[in-house]
Every structure is written in structure tokens, then in C-alpha cells.
Amino acid sequence: MKLLFIGDIVGSPGRKALAELLPGLQAQHGLDVVVANGENSAGGNGITPDTAAEIYAAGVDVITCGDHLWDQKEVEILLDEEPRFVRPVNYPAGTPGQGSTVIERAGQPTVGVINAQGNTFMRGELDNPFRSVKEESVSYTHLRAHETVRN
């Protein structure tokens, strides 16, 4: 299985580069899953449903975010309606959205994506990212935990 993780997609130039380059990378490398950080895709300040749509259209399967999540009010739509949009799992209980998602495709291993935000030099009250990821991963142990993927 081939996975690609992309760091910050920043503004219009980042979205344009993604749209131009990702299809070729997918074809050249046979990528199975693409995860990208989109929290700065709206002019370097947050993400909107429109910028998320561009990122998904370019071939990204899951969008993660971090401390710039709340920079655009429209993000609430993504948190409420888009299962492929993953906020940090270690945000306080009751925060809208989800901290993880699962990608299931016929003939491929199931892939779980958990997003956590570090808490060093960060504002706000974040739970311990290591503890949060460990707790979240327990809910996924039933997903082909007995299989080992080698590629």
C-alpha cells in the first residue's frame, strides 16, 4: 500500500500546485491514499468548504487541520458534514467534528487516519496528544488488526 502525506497547503498557490502535481504523482507512484493538511488553504488563514472542495477534487482523500482550524467561520460546515475532514483528536470533549476517520476500499487494507496536535507552545487547552491517539486507536483495533501490510 502506498500512502502520501502532504504538509500545509497554503493559499491559492498551494491549491494550484496540488491540482497540477498530485494527479501525476498518483499515476507515477500508484498512490492508494493521500492525506493533506489543509488548515492554511484559504489564503493562509484556515479552510473553507470551497477550498476543501478544491483539495478533494485534486485527489486528496483526507484533509487534516490544526491550530488554524477556526480561522474561517465556514469551517463549521466541514466539521458537521464532511467525514473526510479530520480535526485534532486531542481537542476538548464536545468540540465539533471528529479526530479520526477510516478509509475503506474494495480489495485494499482499511486505513485509519488519526490527527493530533502537539501542545508545546500552543494556545488553548489541548489534551495530551499521545494519550488521545492511544485512546482513539483502541476503537479501531477490530479493523484487520491481524493483518500486516508490506509493500
For each feature predicted by the language model, list its residue ranges:
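Core catalytic region of metal-dependent phosphoesterases/phosphodiesterases
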Residues: I6, K16-G97
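Flexible, glycine/proline-enriched loop segments at strand-loop-helix junctions
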Residues: I9, N115-D127
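Divalent metal-coordination and catalytic microenvironments
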Residues: D8, I63, I114, R150
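Single conserved hydrophobic/aromatic residue that forms the stacking wall/gate
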Residues: H142-N151
